[in-house]
Amino acid sequence: VLRQNGIKTRYYGLDKNQNLTHSNAELAKEAVCGLFENRQIPNDLTLLACGTSTPDQLLPSHASMVHGELANYPMEIFSSAGVCLTSLQALKICYSNILAGLHQKAVCVASELTSPALVSKFYDPEYEATHDNPDKDPYMAFEKDFMRFMLFVYIWIN
C-alpha cells in the first residue's frame, strides 16, 4: 500500500510521546517565514490569506491566529475553510486583490494539522478487541489503521 499511494515522507505535529509540537497557526507561520530572507516578513506585505480545514479553534479565525503568530504589521487578513480547495480559495483572494489593485504584495498559506486526531489512543480499542479475540472480524481495525496511516497523515504546507 505504501508503494502505491506515493507518499514518500510523512510529517507529524507530534513528538514521540504523541504531544503536539506545533499548532496549525504555528505551522502556517513557519511556512510564511520560510518564504523570506532571514525569515523576516516585509512591512509592505498588506494581505495575508490563509486556508485550512483544521483550524486550532473556531474564533478568532485561522488567519487572525497566523497573523498573531507572525507578530507582524497591520494587514488585511482572510480565512478560507473547507476541505480540498481552501488553498485555492486563499490563492484566489490574493490574486484577485492584486489584480484589482487593492494590494501590491500578498501572501497565501494553506496548512493542515490532523495529527491530534491520529494519536494511537483513539485507535487502540479496536485493535485490542480484534487482537484479543481471533474470532472477531479484524476488518474495522484494519480500516481505521489504513485511514490513519495512508490517508490522513500527510500534513502539507504551501
Predicted regions and their residues:
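Generic, well-ordered alpha-helical segments
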Residues: 16-28, 54, 58, 82, ...
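A general structural-boundary detector
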Residues: 15, 53, 74-77
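Short glycine-rich or small-residue beta-strand-to-loop segments that form or flank ligand, phosphate
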Residues: 46-54
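Short acidic/histidine-centered micro-motifs embedded in hydrophobic/aromatic stretches
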Residues: 4, 51, 109
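Acyl-thioester C-C bond-transforming condensing/cleaving domain
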Residues: 33-38, 42-43, 58-60, 64-158
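Conserved active-site "lid/cap" helical segment
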Residues: 1-46
